[in-house]
From Swiss-Prot:
SMART domains: S4. Keywords: Ribonucleoprotein, Ribosomal protein, RNA-binding, rRNA-binding. GO terms for molecular function: rRNA binding; structural constituent of ribosome. Residues 43-115 form the S4 RNA-binding domain. NCBIfam families: PRK04313.1. The keyword Ribosomal protein applies. The gene is rps4e. This is Small ribosomal subunit protein eS4.
Length: 255
């Protein structure tokens, strides 16, 4: 028997707990379409517009606003109301000139942090993997599905790509995807935790205990001197050692 593929519908009770939807709103809710972020770390654009930003009272109103192109994600108009919005994405309200960055946040799991127009010109991407493409150039695969090409002059000795390591962070312009900077995952780097019970905490790496694949343990120290341990999988570098965060953070998250 042929497989039917994934389900097109999502029951409200099965939705991630951080989605601001209630059971009384209906049996079913919006299921994100396949895209840059997994369902457990994203929220559909419709729910963001209606329930988080409050620009619509009903799903029909939200779909209409989205279809008319009033919202940009990472510098591009998105008209798919199921589009998954996730960590580090930059949201622009075209008509009002407001900008937000999606950040991890304690208890609520995520927050829309207001940012300036200047800061909205770039985003951070965690390097999940690297590969060699035609011509010997190196391609970086980021956490949001983007691919950034590093051109090398000598494929046998790709010195241009050697600084870029897995789980490090690149700073790129949006939507052009020009490389603006790189922050490695190492002792002294400033990170934000985007998973587990310490989600939203910010601190500098004190030590990294290696483990199988990404199951290592990272110890970070926050601004109050408190030490926190979390999985290597949950840390996102937001600045290299001896530098302040590349992005603005919610009040109280850092110094």
């Amino acid at each position: 028997m042929a497989r039917m593929g994934g389900r097109r519908h999502l029951k409200t009770l099965a939705a991630p707990k951080f989605w601001p939807v209630r059971q009384r709103a209906g049996i079913f809710t919006v299921k994100p379409s396949p895209g840059p972020h997994p369902i457990e770390r994203s929220i559909p654009l419709l729910i963001l517009v209606r329930d988080v930003l409050g620009y619509a009272k009903t799903a029909r109103e939200a779909r209409k606003l989205i279809a008319e192109g009033h919202f940009k994600i990472d510098g591009r108009v998105r008209r798919n109301y199921k589009y998954p919005v996730g960590f580090m994405d930059v949201i622009e309200i075209v008509d009002t000139g407001e900008f937000y960055r999606v950040l991890p946040y304690p208890t609520r799991f995520f927050t829309l942090h207001p940012i300036s127009k200047e800061e909205a010109q770039f985003k951070l991407g965690r390097i999940e993997d690297k590969s060699t493409v035609k011509g010997g150039h190196i391609q970086l695969h980021l956490h949001d599905g983007r691919n950034v090409l590093i051109r090398v002059s000598d494929p046998t000795n790709p010195v241009e790509a050697k600084p870029y390591k897995t789980l490090g962070t690149v700073k790129i312009s949006i939507p052009e995807q020009q490389l603006l900077g790189y922050a490695p995952l190492e002792v002294g780097s400033l990170v934000i935790i985007f998973g587990g019970r310490n989600v939203g905490r910010v601190g500098r790496i004190v030590s990294i205990q290696p483990g199988m694949r990404r199951r290592g343990i990272v110890t970070i120290e926050d601004a109050r001197g408190e030490k926190i341990q979390t999985s290597l999988e949950y840390v996102f570098v937001i600045a290299p050692p001896n530098e302040e965060p590349w992005i603005s953070l919610p009040e109280g998250a850092w110094k």
